[in-house]
Amino acid sequence: MSFPPALAAESAPPLGFGELEKSGAVIGEVRVDTRNIFDLGNPAESGLFYGTVNRLHIVTRPEVIARTLLFKSGDRVSLQKIDETERLLRTLRIIHDVEIRPAAFEDGKVDIEVTTRDTWTLDLTGSYSRSGGNDKSAFGVKERNLLGTGLSVGYSRTSDADRSGTEIDLAYGQAFGGRTQIAFNRGRFDDGARTSFLVDRPFYSLDTRGAVRGGWSNEDRIDPIYNSGELVSEFRHRLKAIEVSAGWSAGLVGGWTRRLSAGADLRDDAYRVEPGRALTIALPLDHRVRAPFLRYELLEDEFVKVKNYRNIARTEFLGLGFHLQVQVARSLEGLGATRSEWLYAAEASDGITFESGHKLLGQATVERRVASTATPLTQGGFAVQLYAPRSTDSLSYASIAADRVRGGGVADQLLLGGTQGLRGYPSRYQAGENRVLANFEQRLYSDWYPFRLIRVGGAAFFDIGRAWGGPNQNLVNGGWLSDVGVGLRLAFDRTAFANVLHLDLAMPLRRTPGIKAVQFLVKTELTF
């Protein structure tokens, strides 16, 4: 494990956690050391700018990190828990880097030191993006680590192709002194409003024995329908949803975790003609779902640590173990549903590492849900991703995904276009009951690190795909579509917000009048 100088240990006992576990060592003192964004002792980060940023930032409180740890004083050393703790800490966007090391070992007891380095968490949003021919802008302020407590508070004003308005949100992942998550969101837009509230104590680790969840949302909006990238129909959609569930698990046994949950989904969807808006399709039908459910989950504990895959020069974890989740529900007319129906959802994923070091990830899904026609809809599909490193700073990436729906109406069709992965075309350019999309990229990860703030990378890409079948096909350009392009990737890895800026030039290879010869896309993503 490699860390910046500020995270490197001056000395360490000769044994690693694996050897300590085999020796039966017990954890003594656990020390948490939370550090500021920049290491002022590093000559590359010792300037006035870095010192000013550190002074403006409030460092994460040690107890925030301590409550995330899966081990404590008196426990026997477990390499699995050490590794999983590192994975959990790296998922916290308020953390830039993590080191967990044995600090001292004597008489069968080992002291452990956990060192973290913060990210900049105050987001003064003033952003613009263009993707699929659509512009999106945002202005606001969001603090993801208020006073170092892990509390996230934000206000934003956004505008995109569908709506504009303001939102406030609050989120806290350590409520009641533990691991309970609380989140609240309230938005007011030119086409309606949205409110949601969530209380969730999840299965936060592979060995967690119980989980409880309750969520509520209420939304009023205008839903658009597009054909050939053009807006052709709009209607008002009001929806209310409630979910409650509780889960049980025996924990991690022999490298596998099994979980069983029970709960209920309640959902009301209502549709209305909106005055002044064109409606060229049949209005969707109101429907209600009242569905008790059972959910089963199976997870294999297999992760690998990599670098220069989905991010630039940052430690990542890829899950290569088998994961299965199956949920079966019965929507009951006797509980207030529009009609009694069996509903289900299943998802399975797995990963393989080849002798060459290349990694293949696969996923398959199937779902039966109530569609906008108030009748059942079945959707199934698969996705495969290949990561093929060429060197420490370059990687070939390929993905292919295919899915199909049977049942439902125009509002339930599968979409394909610029914001759906086909970068050379307008957003929602094709729609249909069947969809296939393949993306190929050659990624470059440079060592250039301007101002110790921005990691720089690039990509050349080729996309090909098609959506077809159903009542809302693109009859103008409904065949296979493809594009080629190049892009710059700027990873702001010292910040807690959307980390990777994508600057792409994409050229569609099958154009019709109205489609630009070159699409310029600007957007922020969490990954490469």
Locations of regions flagged by a protein language model:
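C-terminal transmembrane beta-barrel domains of outer membrane proteins
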Residues: A8, H323-F528
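Transmembrane beta-strand segments that form the barrel wall of outer-membrane beta-barrel proteins
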Residues: L69, W120-R130, S137-D160, I168, ...
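Feature captures outer-membrane beta-barrel proteins of Gram-negative bacteria and organelles
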Residues: S137-N145, S164-G177, T195-D207, V212-G214, ...
